[in-house]
Design a protein with these regions (language model features):
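Mg2+-dependent phosphoryl-transfer enzymes with acidic/Ser/Thr/Gly-rich catalytic loops
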Residues: 5, 12, 17, 37, ...
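Active-site T/S-Asp motif of two-component receiver
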Residues: 24
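Short, structured coil segments at secondary-structure junctions
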Residues: 72-73, 81, 164, 222-223, ...
Length: 276
């Protein structure tokens, strides 16, 4: 939303009670200092136990996301900014679904490695993210995970990627670039349709999105129930669209507060099937 962010407690209980699914960023939204806390994991379990759908959507790579897709109580993880969905089959084995076919992925992969090398050559201090070995459909430049790039260097990385015809977004830790029409919103629509047989746009009022950075702006713009964890304020002046609500807690603590707000409203509502 373009206006000021409202405190989470201003989210009407009647709206919270109707939520059937939560889409969330991972780094610095669900996790804290690079790991999921016990409280955040319990919040995921509580949401799932109440019958809500939960789908984390991240710029992190497939390789990084695989273990969490198997371990966390979520419907799926959508990795690499909407390109790949990781879920479990009936036997609990990892299943990967792609938006692009194998030939297109191979062609794009080769092009992206060339762009990554150009970024490293042309932007002082730029380094390829340490998790890049697990990436299949994008590239990532570290700006805040294991190194620090000043804002002008981050802007230059984005400019180089876009000059090569790539999409480029900035998360709380990386600059991600990729070829293709997918993004977090397209990935959310695709995953909900493919895995849950639901039309996300037809029931937007029943879904919430939680995020923390400029990489979430498209989701903040699209979802009426959008929430930023408190550390979103780091990026507040750069947000073309702000989340409607903001938590008091940062990172995983903020996510826990969102889960508690939804569950409290649902528990106070008499009867009803959450997956109608």
């Amino acid at each position: 939303m373009p206006g000021a962010m409202q405190p989470l407690q201003d989210w009407p209980a009647s709206e919270r009670a109707g939520i059937v699914g939560v889409l969330t960023d991972i780094d610095d939204t669900l996790t804290t200092e690079g790991a999921i806390t016990r409280d955040a994991l319990q919040a995921l379990e509580a949401l799932a136990g109440a019958g809500l759908h939960v789908i984390p959507i991240t710029g992190r790579p497939v390789g990084w996301s695989e273990a969490f897709a198997l371990q966390w109580p979520v419907d799926a993880i959508v990795a690499e900014n909407g390109a790949v969905a990781l879920t479990r089959d009936a036997q609990g084995r990892l299943r990967k679904l792609y938006q692009q076919d194998a030939a297109e992925r191979a062609t794009n992969f080769a092009r992206m490695q060339q762009v990554a090398q150009r970024v490293v050559r042309e932007v002082p201090g730029a380094t390829i993210s340490r998790d890049s070995g697990g990436r299949e459909t994008d590239i990532a430049i570290d700006h805040s995970e294991f190194t620090h790039l000043p804002q002008d260097a981050v802007d230059r990385v984005v400019a180089v990627m876009r000059s090569e015809g790539m999409n480029a977004t900035v998360s709380s830790i990386h600059v991600n670039g990729w070829y293709g029409s997918h993004d977090k919103l397209a990935g959310a629509r695709w995953a909900v349709r493919t895995l849950l047989a639901r039309d996300l746009d037809a029931e937007l009022e029943r879904w919430a999105y939680v995020g923390d950075s400029t990489n979430d702006v498209l989701m903040f713009q699209h979802f009426p129930h959008s929430i930023g964890v408190a550390n979103i304020r780091r990026f507040e002046q750069q947000l073309a669209f702000k989340p409607r609500y903001v938590t008091e807690g940062e990172r995983g603590e903020g996510f826990v507060q969102v889960a508690q707000a939804i569950l409290a409203a649902r528990h106070s509502r008499a009867g009803g099937n959450p997956r109608h």
